[in-house]
Amino acid sequence: MDAQDIESRHPLIGARPRRRALRSLSILLAAALLLGLVLFYANGTGSGTAVDPVRVDNEFPWTNDMLAWQRCGFHFRTVRNYMNDPSGPMYYKGWYHLFYQHNKDFAYWGNITWGHAVSRDLINWQHLPVAVGPDHWYDISGVWTGSIIVVSEDRVVMLFTGGTKSFDQSINLAEAADPSDPLLLKWIKYDNNPILWPPPGIVRDDFRDPNPIWYNASESTYHIVVGSKNDSLQHTGIALVYLTKDFKKFDLLPTVLHSVDKVGMWECVEVYPVATTGPLLHKAIDNFDVDRVLDRSTVKHVLKASMNDEWHDYYAIGTFDPIGNKWTPDDETVDVGIGLRYDWGKFYASRTFFDPLKQRRIIWGYIGEVDSQKADIAKGWASLQGIPRSVLYDVKTGTNVLTWPIEEMEGLRMARKDFSGIKIKKGSTVELSDFGDAFQIDIEAEFTISKEALEATIEADVGYNCSSSGGAAIRGTLGPFGLLVLANQDLTENTATYFYVSKGIDGSLITHFCQDETRSSKANDIVKRVVGGTVPVLDGETFAVRILVDHSVIESFAMGGRTSATSRAYPTEAINSAARVFLFNNATGVDVIAESVKIWQMNSTYNDFYHF
């Protein structure tokens, strides 16, 4: 294939070196600021009157065809209306269960219930009636996130967060009316709810998302974690732990499990074990069975929290002492809220569960919308769940976990097209064609830069940052390079998934994995960002990426799942048969080889009501 001249044909992808582009950007920003100040005072809004940043006359005129195209083919989604946090995922009596936050009446947040769906294989889902809804004073504003615990063959309990009329938060109990029912259709709330209120010193709307983290078999006691914060300290995120034997009476442990200053409210807190060596290395460990591991030195514990201040899921690897109620990070510089993320994009409120069927841990996270509420109402639904991912310890780096689409996703692959040995010259693009529609696909790609080219580069972009360095349009010595998906023919619409390599004066290399949404749509009433972070690339490894494109969702995984980035894309032209895939190399100093690119068409899954 012949590479095409990116500078002459596609100036939006990058026609200038980085410094000149930044200087031009600064001039544009200054002009925009001056114009904004003139309009601000001319319109008399300096008094503090709130102004809607998206004016009605700026809303994009979406057509029914465009909106219908956005609905995904193989992601978990509601049949209609709104969803957010996953809750209580589990495997029970032959069925995978997923509960989720759901407004069954409208395509926006409010009137939150627990939606409920079941599956035999984690990819085809049947939606059941709502499990529980807001029908008591303690949950009248919503039945919010929580968890499910299978206590015994005769008892399955649900712990959920309730919101009062004034949005005070409490922890509440419901139980499966018939534990012998594999579908768990009916739930009964406890007569004496709430079972927990925020303890002294905790604000009444900063207390939520109960989740079991350990079972002390010798004392028949469950340890339940609840997320919170303490603003009397330093805007500190904290994890509180309660002990219970019967889920009706709870005792708060006197010390917090862990806390981190200046990160704000912790939501959806989890602690779970990962094997670091030994026979369980490639399998998961159940929280309730971790004490059966003979050599505890082969196990680490992940602490994860969803940061309410910024809506990202952070995690860290460390040591868990359940008796002393203490979790300690291996590395304080990458503690929870300041270090590692599961995903740098639109992925939040994640929950994991142990799958006894395949001895694995699976993580769910919800993917919200970034368009206007008006558009969501018009299309009749909003938000979805990310692809279920397996979670394993990364034995090669020893510093992170790997999250990767579950193996069942490969069963959706259909026709495949292979490309190999494509040289992508500096400042060029290469269209990948002849594989059918490009909006419901699975891509695996590997790139290399010659060792000689890397060694010849003295220093390159040591201060690079995905979110603030200009995205795929800004050219550097060793990047960006990667793929453009959901692209139209002239590349005025595309989402770029790419690597960017920085080199220090000492010869050290840092690889950034980024996803640029800024040209994903010509619509102007959606949020478009550049997301991403650094990712370990070890000696001898290629730059490897997997991208799952499912209409308006793009989930990308770098280096076998060491990091990932999820984006919502709402193209106006690059839809249906107009969607394209390109390779690109916007580096100024090196050519890049696409050693291997494999693209599969993906089948759709069943996602509809259960037929009784």
Swiss-Prot record:
SUPFAM superfamilies, A to Z: Arabinanase/levansucrase/invertase (SSF75005), Concanavalin A-like lectins/glucanases (SSF49899)
SMART domains for this protein: Glyco_32
Summary of temperature dependence: Stable up to 40 degrees Celsius for both catalytic activities.
Substrates-to-products reaction catalysed: [1-beta-D-fructofuranosyl-(2->1)-]m+1 alpha-D-glucopyranoside + [1-beta-D-fructofuranosyl-(2->1)-]n+1 alpha-D-glucopyranoside = [1-beta-D-fructofuranosyl-(2->1)-]m alpha-D-glucopyranoside + [1-beta-D-fructofuranosyl-(2->1)-]n+1 beta-D-fructofuranosyl-(2->6)-alpha-D-glucopyranoside (m > 0, n >= 0); [beta-D-fructosyl-(2->1)-]m + [beta-D-fructosyl-(2->1)-]n = [beta-D-fructosyl-(2->1)-]m-1 + [beta-D-fructosyl-(2->1)-]n+1
Vacuolar compartment spans: 46-612
Keyword Transmembrane helix: yes
GO biological process, one term: carbohydrate metabolic process
Pfam families for this protein: Glyco_hydro_32C, Glyco_hydro_32N
Domain of life: Eukaryota
Disulfide bonds: C466-C514
Biological role stated in the UniProt entry: Involved in the synthesis of fructan of the inulin neoseries. Catalyzes a self-transfer between identical oligosaccharides of the 1-kestose series.
Protein's name according to its UniProt entry: Bifunctional 6(G)-fructosyltransferase/2,1-fructan:2,1-fructan 1-fructosyltransferase
Protein source organism: Allium cepa (Onion)
